[in-house]
A protein has these predicted regions:
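Short acidic catalytic loops
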Residues: 158, 162-179, 239, 243-244
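Gly/Ser/Thr-rich loop/hinge elements
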Residues: 180-240, 278-282, 295-299, 305-306
Length: 340
């Protein structure tokens, strides 16, 4: 027993020595690299961390020549002493990898974002000709659970009011929806969604994370994202739905469109969406700055992945959302709802 304990002690000691030697070697190499760009070690490690996050997590990471990118970015950061000195280099990296859905924000910018009070337009709804229900959802930059619940209540109040006219034909207008909290939008629209699984996030390794709507709750996988404070509501009739999309339909607005994609009796009208059909995730750096990156694609319930934008079933060459009865996209939707 004594010799066994002694062997274990010796092995642990050797392991610690190896770790110390490797750490010392790594630190020496890091200092050499930092010196080669006339950067402080702190600034170099900070920039290295940001680049490593991009290289490992960015949704299009496998299409990028990272060696070339890093060379140019480190050159941009030459002479950096403080972590903040590397911010222009990080912005350059975002530009070089053509990252245009997320952002990089300094600690002071993050403080302003957290204090900013976002206002959102409530949904517009009305009964159109031929007893067609019209519901338009705008951008919803959620700030709190209270705001999510208020938004959900507004959307469901609109749906219940329209459904009281015994409608079975619906128009969901997403042409002015540039994103925000997709879960609040999907929860509000729950009565119009016909399946529990309404879409997926797709990781770079192919892993699928389902979007679920059930019993007035929306989930990402098995994790609850939002639960309605209202009782569940069921439509009087099986809905036939026209979804309107366009160039200003973006991000979570595209997620809502994807949730209806593949549903029976649904057709899309308008123009191609913005092309931000992906999920973003915030990565916080050591000084409090935030790097928001797109990390997962959207897929509809049938497994179709939207790598860029989403195309309508019927392209309508018209100006973006006028919310007018003379709107050609609305007219095309009404024609399909009533005649096909």
């Amino acid at each position: 027993m004594y010799w066994r304990k002694k062997k274990i002690f010796i092995l642990i000691s050797l392991l610690l020595i190896c770790v110390c030697l490797f750490s010392g070697y790594y630190l020496k190499i890091t200092i050499q690299k930092a010196n080669s760009y006339s950067m402080s070690t702190k600034a170099f490690l900070y920039l290295q961390k940001a680049l490593n996050i991009m290289e490992k997590k960015f949704i299009y990471k496998d299409t990028i020549d990272w060696d070339s990118i890093k060379k140019e970015v480190y050159k941009k950061a030459e002479g950096s002493v403080l972590t903040s000195d590397t911010y222009p280099a990080i912005q350059l990296a975002r530009s070089l990898i053509k990252e245009n859905h997320g952002f990089f924000a300094s600690p002071s910018q993050m403080e302003l974002l957290e204090k900013e009070e976002f206002r959102f337009e409530p949904p517009i709804y009305r009964l159109l000709e031929k007893n067609v229900a019209y519901l338009s959802l705008f951008t919803f930059p959620s700030t709190s659970d209270e705001a999510d619940q208020a938004y959900n209540k507004q959307v469901q109040t609109a749906i219940r009011a329209l459904d009281s006219s015994n409608v079975d034909k619906w128009i969901i207008d997403l042409r002015k929806n540039q994103g925000g909290n997709m879960w609040a939008m999907l929860l509000g629209l729950g009565p119009l969604l016909d399946k529990e699984c309404i879409g997926f996030f797709i990781r770079n390794n192919g892993e699928k994370i389902p979007w679920k709507h059930k019993k007035n709750t929306v989930k990402q996988g098995n994790s609850c994202c939002l639960k309605s404070s209202l009782p569940p509501y069921q439509l009087k009739n099986t809905p036939k739905i026209a979804v309107l999309i366009g160039n200003n339909t973006a991000s979570s607005g595209e997620a809502v469109a994807v949730a209806f994609s593949g549903q029976k009796n649904v057709r899309f009208f308008g123009q191609h969406t913005s092309g931000f059909a992906n999920a973003t995730y915030p990565f916080f750096l050591s000084d409090g700055a935030c790097l928001l990156l797109p990390v997962m694609h959207f897929s509809n319930r049938l497994g179709q992945i939207f790598y860029t934008n989403m195309a309508p079933d019927e392209v309508i060459n018209a100006n973006e959302a006028t919310n007018s009865l003379k709107d050609p996209t609305i007219e095309a939707a009404i024609d399909w709802l009533c005649n096909f």
